[in-house]
Amino acid sequence: MQLNELNCVILCGGKSSRMGQDKSKLILKNQNLTQFQVEKFSKIFKNVYVSAKEDKFENHFSLIKDSLEFEVYSPMLALYSILSNFKNEFVFVLSVDSPKVGENELLKMLPFLEQNYKIIIAKTPLHKHPLCGFYHSSLAQTCKNFLEKNEQKIGLLFSEIKTKFVEFEDEDAFLNLNFYEEYEKFKSELR
């Protein structure tokens, strides 16, 4: 299996409460963070989609909207909505605010898709990264079951589904832009 045979979905529906503004629209090199991620991953994957509650990008991207079945704002709803759009395949899911994840990290996770796992996510010494990994589309129903019980955390899947945590040493590769200072620092590194 090759990365260019797979689909990628960039999650852009978070509340961005710590950032104080919509992270998906932060500007990097004359484009917003969503464009930055879509452009980068379009060179790697078959298709790149954007997941959000509504189309805040004016049809600029292939959009997967959150399901209206549940009136919540959560990563589990986004994952359910994403996986419901695919059949019998793995999908790479990444939050928009992880701009340093790239092909090297993906290639380290890729071999595990051929093994007997349904979830393959990145793990560093300090954190598991549930919004950086491959999820099999067959998990949509499991996500729905959690939502029906008002369980919103993606981490709940790991105890029920065969999951591979792929170990990475470099915390920096999985940087999340949660605060404005982190965004400013990352922006200055791009110059």
Curated annotation (Swiss-Prot):
The N-terminal domain determines nucleotide recognition and specific binding, while the C-terminal domain determines the specific binding to the target protein. InterPro entries: MobA-like_NTP_Trfase, Molybde_CF_guanTrfase, Nucleotide-diphossugar_trans. GTP binds at residues 11-13, 23, 66, 97. Mg(2+) binds at residue 97. CDD domains: MobA (cd02503). Its EC number is 2.7.7.77. The keyword RNA-binding does not apply. GO terms for molecular function: GTP binding; metal ion binding; molybdenum cofactor guanylyltransferase activity. This is Molybdenum cofactor guanylyltransferase. Its cofactor is Mg(2+). Transfers a GMP moiety from GTP to Mo-molybdopterin (Mo-MPT) cofactor (Moco or molybdenum cofactor) to form Mo-molybdopterin guanine dinucleotide (Mo-MGD) cofactor. It catalyses: Mo-molybdopterin + GTP + H(+) = Mo-molybdopterin guanine dinucleotide + diphosphate. It comes from Campylobacter jejuni subsp. jejuni serotype O:6 (strain 81116 / NCTC 11828). Monomer. GO terms for biological process: bis(molybdopterin guanine dinucleotide)molybdenum biosynthetic process. GO terms for cellular component: cytoplasm. It is found in: Cytoplasm. Belongs to the MobA family.
